[in-house]
Amino acid sequence: NLPAMIPALDQILSPDGLGIGARHITLSTSGLVPKILELAKYPAQIRLAISLHGGDNRTREQIMPINKHYPIEELIDACERFIEERKKMITLEYILIKGVNDDLGQAILLARHARRLNAKVNLIPYNKVEGMKWERPELSQINAFRSQVEKENAPRVTLRMEKGHDIDAACGQLRLRETVESC
C-alpha cells in the first residue's frame, strides 16, 4: 500500500512529526516488484527488507502467494535495481518452517540470492500458531541451515531467536481469540 505508506513515512521522518531518522526505519515487503522500483525513487534513506522465505519459486509460493505474480527472478532483479539506485544493503528475511523450507538445498539457494545482492540474511524460526499446520524446526536443523548459508558465503547472516513463543507472545502469534457459538 505504497500510496498510504509514503505520507505515513513522511510524517514519521518529519521534525514536525515523530522525527525518526530514515536510517532507523526498515520497510518490509512481501515483494511487489513495481512498488519496490517505485520505492527506490523515494528520497529518504530508509532500509528495505524482503520477505523471501523460499529459495525457489515452488517453495516460496507455499509461503508467499504473491510469488505467483512476481516470481523470485523478477523480485531479485527489482532488488538489484533498488540497490543500484539507493546504494543501500537490503535484508532478505527468511522464516524457517519445518519440512517446508528448512532443507540445506534451500540454504544454498538463499545464500546464492544473498551473494548476488550483497544482502544481509535474517533467519527467523517459525513460531507455532494454533490452527496452523506449520512447525518450528528443531534447533539442530536451524543451526545446520544457518551454517550452510554461512558456508555458501552469504555476506551477513543473523538468526533471530525470539522469546515468548512458548506462551504464544512471539512474532506472528499475537491475535484475537474468540469462541464462536453455533446458532
Model-derived features: positions:
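Conserved AdoMet/S-adenosylmethionine-binding subsite of the radical SAM
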Residues: 1-154
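Conserved phosphate-binding/catalytic loops in two-lobed NTP-binding clefts
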Residues: 151, 155-165
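Radical SAM enzyme core and accessory elements
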Residues: 164-183
